Amino acid sequence: MNWLTNVVRPKIRNILRRETPENLWIKCPDSGQLVFYKDVEANQFVIPGSNYHMRMGATARLKSMFDNETWFDVALPEVTPDPLKFRDERRYADRIKDARARTGMNDAVKVGFGKLEGMGVVIAVQDFDFMGGSLGMAAGEAIVRGLELAVEKTSPFIVFAASGGARMQEGILSLMQMPRTTVAVQMLREAKLPYIVVQTNPTTGGVTASYAMLGDVHIAEPGALIGFAGARVIEQTIREKLPEGFQRAEYLLDHGMVDMVVHRHDLRPTLARLCRLLTKSPAVEHPKPAPQLPPPAKTVEAADAPAVAPTA
């Protein structure tokens, strides 16, 4: 009995054991309900029921925007990974390596070129999972390159902003990306091409103070945090209590800071419609299905026809 208990049973358990993924379930920050990860992923990372918009990765975002989930990844300029040899509790170079291994991205911004309901567009997406989507030299170069490509292709440029601000580990070099991206936006404007900004949760700091507030149209996702400094910092500075919902998308819409708040499921058709309106392009006409005609009547050969008695 001891042999069965001590030897055989543990081996059987090891054979039958299955590792449970860490992200099998997601807890909704709004309602607290546990939701199966695959269900959230299939719903574009919107929690069913509460409609809470989770953060969405760059690749998933591009996949949800482009026709047939296909696009061309835009080659981005390489930059010095650690120009200041910065170190706090850890080396900045090590933080970059960890972020790249975790996200599969080179830096916080991914740029793609493809079709949005038949129209060529350039889309840049900030991924908050990569060091908080912070704006550094590489991210700035990516935004500038995306704007340059939009001018080359005479295409609209759409950016999905998600950032905590400038990347402190790069000092003044990260702050320089604010005027650089602003100049690049002006280049797009001089080419008379549309620039649409989608502000996701969160859009703060130096990103808000530069290209994220320079669009022809500003769209926000429901519940997105949008602002420059944090609410607690503002309260401590002005020594006043801020109104409820301050810096949230709906509050900014009520006060004229954004043009519309759009559910994630409606973003794709909304962006396509805006691009067509701003470029004065005709609407895409989808072919109508051919009408269902009744089957032709069966013809009867003379030899197969039944004999009919002559009438008197």
From Swiss-Prot:
<dbReference type="InterPro" id="IPR029045">
    <property type="entry name" value="ClpP/crotonase-like_dom_sf"/>
</dbReference>
<protein>
    <recommendedName>
        <fullName>Acetyl-coenzyme A carboxylase carboxyl transferase subunit beta</fullName>
        <ecNumber>2.1.3.15</ecNumber>
    </recommendedName>
</protein>
<dbReference type="GO" id="GO:0006633">
    <property type="term" value="P:fatty acid biosynthetic process"/>
</dbReference>
<comment type="pathway">
    <text>Lipid metabolism; malonyl-CoA biosynthesis; malonyl-CoA from acetyl-CoA: step 1/1.</text>
</comment>
<feature type="region of interest" description="Disordered">
    <location>
        <begin position="283"/>
        <end position="312"/>
    </location>
</feature>
<dbReference type="GO" id="GO:0016743">
    <property type="term" value="F:carboxyl- or carbamoyltransferase activity"/>
</dbReference>
<dbReference type="GO" id="GO:2001295">
    <property type="term" value="P:malonyl-CoA biosynthetic process"/>
</dbReference>
<dbReference type="GO" id="GO:0009329">
    <property type="term" value="C:acetate CoA-transferase complex"/>
</dbReference>
<keyword id="KW-0444">Lipid biosynthesis</keyword>
<keyword id="KW-0963">Cytoplasm</keyword>
<keyword id="KW-0276">Fatty acid metabolism</keyword>
<keyword id="KW-0547">Nucleotide-binding</keyword>
<dbReference type="GO" id="GO:0005524">
    <property type="term" value="F:ATP binding"/>
</dbReference>
<comment type="function">
    <text>Component of the acetyl coenzyme A carboxylase (ACC) complex. Biotin carboxylase (BC) catalyzes the carboxylation of biotin on its carrier protein (BCCP) and then the CO(2) group is transferred by the transcarboxylase to acetyl-CoA to form malonyl-CoA.</text>
</comment>
<keyword id="KW-0808">Transferase</keyword>
<keyword id="KW-0443">Lipid metabolism</keyword>
<feature type="domain" description="CoA carboxyltransferase N-terminal">
    <location>
        <begin position="24"/>
        <end position="293"/>
    </location>
</feature>
<dbReference type="InterPro" id="IPR011762">
    <property type="entry name" value="COA_CT_N"/>
</dbReference>
<dbReference type="Pfam" id="PF01039">
    <property type="entry name" value="Carboxyl_trans"/>
</dbReference>
<dbReference type="GO" id="GO:0003989">
    <property type="term" value="F:acetyl-CoA carboxylase activity"/>
</dbReference>
<comment type="similarity">
    <text>Belongs to the AccD/PCCB family.</text>
</comment>
<keyword id="KW-0275">Fatty acid biosynthesis</keyword>
<dbReference type="InterPro" id="IPR034733">
    <property type="entry name" value="AcCoA_carboxyl_beta"/>
</dbReference>
<dbReference type="InterPro" id="IPR000438">
    <property type="entry name" value="Acetyl_CoA_COase_Trfase_b_su"/>
</dbReference>
<feature type="compositionally biased region" description="Low complexity">
    <location>
        <begin position="298"/>
        <end position="312"/>
    </location>
</feature>
<comment type="subunit">
    <text>Acetyl-CoA carboxylase is a heterohexamer composed of biotin carboxyl carrier protein (AccB), biotin carboxylase (AccC) and two subunits each of ACCase subunit alpha (AccA) and ACCase subunit beta (AccD).</text>
</comment>
<keyword id="KW-0067">ATP-binding</keyword>
